[in-house]
């Protein structure tokens, strides 16, 4: 899975993250920190967010802090069966590049890991 994610980054020129989908609790929200929120980062790191930092959260915890890293809870492990690849972009980056990177990651994993792609979607601010 990590190779699929790195391959997508190299081919599309965007950052792609991967998480264990089954460990996500409820709906996902892309949010901006008020400052002081905490996250249990991968490998035992502890993040204290600054005001304005971009984060992805489920209904219980922060899953990823942009430019700091992902959480331990949803880390891909040997027993992971369902993954979510995701990416962020700043205004001015066309969604086609995100879709290209996510497609490379999903197709690579499906081909070499024997998985199935459920969907590839790009959400733009204000579209939902």
How should these model regions be labeled?
Residues 1-128:
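RNA/tRNA-interacting regions in translation and RNA-turnover enzymes
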């Amino acid at each position: 899975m990590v190779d699929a994610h790195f391959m997508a980054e190299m081919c599309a020129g965007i950052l792609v993250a991967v998480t264990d989908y089954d460990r996500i609790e409820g709906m996902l929200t892309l949010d901006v920190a008020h400052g002081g929120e905490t996250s249990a980062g991968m490998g035992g790191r502890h993040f204290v967010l600054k005001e304005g930092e971009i984060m992805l959260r489920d209904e219980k915890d922060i899953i990823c802090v942009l430019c700091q890293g992902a959480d331990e809870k949803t880390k891909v492990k040997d027993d992971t069966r369902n993954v979510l690849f995701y990416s962020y972009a700043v205004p001015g980056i066309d969604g086609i590049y995100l879709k290209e990177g996510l497609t490379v990651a999903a197709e690579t994993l499906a081909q070499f890991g024997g998985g199935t792609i459920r969907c590839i979607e790009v959400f733009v601010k204000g579209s939902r």
